[in-house]
């Protein structure tokens, strides 16, 4: 029986393998969720660089949000990363949910990023 950490790593690698197959050179919008915060970044895997990022740890977001661990905070992060991505010249991305299911905070980031101008 695999430990929880091994199972998460295996699930994340399976998702990333599927993303790599359909990416066609597009950068990926990678989302990570912890119990207290949420992080999102647009990564260009070809160049190995992060093009834009946002998280609930940023000073301006921490002061305006009640907590970094709810759906409202995730939506703000999604909107912010989309805004920064469009400013960096990124329109089309592939969504990398990692080992997390597409529900709740992960879904809120994705929907807010779509509203912010990213296509996936």
Swiss-Prot record:
One of its GO terms (molecular function) is structural constituent of ribosome. Keywords: Ribonucleoprotein, Ribosomal protein, RNA-binding, rRNA-binding. It comes from the Bacteria. Part of the 50S ribosomal subunit; part of the 5S rRNA/L5/L18/L25 subcomplex. Contacts the 5S and 23S rRNAs. Belongs to the universal ribosomal protein uL18 family. Signal peptide: none annotated. Disulfide bonds: none annotated. GO terms for cellular component: cytosolic large ribosomal subunit. The keyword Cell inner membrane does not apply. The gene is rplR. Pfam families: Ribosomal_L18p. GO terms for biological process: translation. This is one of the proteins that bind and probably mediate the attachment of the 5S RNA into the large ribosomal subunit, where it forms part of the central protuberance. PANTHER family: 39S RIBOSOMAL PROTEIN L18, MITOCHONDRIAL, LARGE RIBOSOMAL SUBUNIT PROTEIN UL18M. This is Large ribosomal subunit protein uL18. HAMAP family: Ribosomal_uL18_B. NCBIfam families: L18_bact.
């Amino acid at each position: 029986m695999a430990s929880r950490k091994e199972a998460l790593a295996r699930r994340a690698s399976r998702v990333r393998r599927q993303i790599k197959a359909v990416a066609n050179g597009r950068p990926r919008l990678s989302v990570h969720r912890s119990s207290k915060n949420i992080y999102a970044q647009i990564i260009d895997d070809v160049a190995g660089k992060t093009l834009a990022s946002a998280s609930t740890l940023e000073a301006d977001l921490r002061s305006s949000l009640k907590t970094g661990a709810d759906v409202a905070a995730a939506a703000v992060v999604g909107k912010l990363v989309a805004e920064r991505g469009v400013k960096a010249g990124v329109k089309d991305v592939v969504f990398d949910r990692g080992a997390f299911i597409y529900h709740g905070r992960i879904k809120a980031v994705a929907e807010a990023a779509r509203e912010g101008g990213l296509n996936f």
